[in-house]
Amino acid sequence: MCPADRQLPVNSEIGWIMYYTPDEELIWNKTDRELICHTPVYDIYRQREVAVNGMEGDYIVADAPEWIVTIAENEGRFVLVRQWRHSSLSLTTEFPGGVSEPGEDPAVTAARELEEETGYRPGTMTHLGTVSPNPALFSNRVHIYLAEELTQTGVRHLDRDENISVIELPVGEVIKNFASVDYSHAFMGTALALYMRYRGYHTDTIQTTTDIKDIEK
């Protein structure tokens, strides 16, 4: 056991043991940063950090723009895009999304990307949540919005190398089939979880526990 760890008793109601270190003892401070690779989609840095206890290390950080996912709901159906993903060499069915311009309001990006990819213009936009795509590597965030009161403009504005099919499927079918071969994008799972919380799916079965900062009190 690390000397800073605190062993807590078993919680008989939820049945787990946790080794707890106060947040202030977990923090590392950045002391240096060096750009080692620039790409069209993100920059790679070598970042030097020092922990409170004196440990030091070099860590790789990917700096990318803010990302957007737009859940578009149209009369009980999700508006989805199906496209080729070059890294996985596979077709995926997912929610529309894109990249924010520097300083751009994420809600503006979410509405714009939806219209560009699907032709649907939203009447209302609701922010469902913001998450880190992978805090171990990426420094940016993913903003997730729900678009409703949709109007089909009949016009799309795809990038030169984009070739996208637009499909509409029942909400329940998409939720049921997530994590199948067709629905493999992890961001879609996060977006679905936030959507289900917003709509109140199964909230009566969720157990709420004490905030971690109150555990030692």
Language-model-derived ranges and their functions:
Residues 13-38:
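Extreme N-terminal tail/first-helix region
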Residues 32-69, 74:
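Acidic, metal-coordinating catalytic segment for phosphate/diphosphate chemistry
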Residues 57, 64-69, 74, 98-187, ...:
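Unchanged
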Residues 73-75, 80-82:
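Glycine/small-residue-rich phosphate/adenosyl-binding loop
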Residues 87-93:
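A conserved beta-turn-beta hairpin within the catalytic core of GNAT-like acetyltransferases
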Residues 190-208:
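Charged phosphate-binding loop/patch that engages nucleotide di/tri-phosphates or the phosphate backbone
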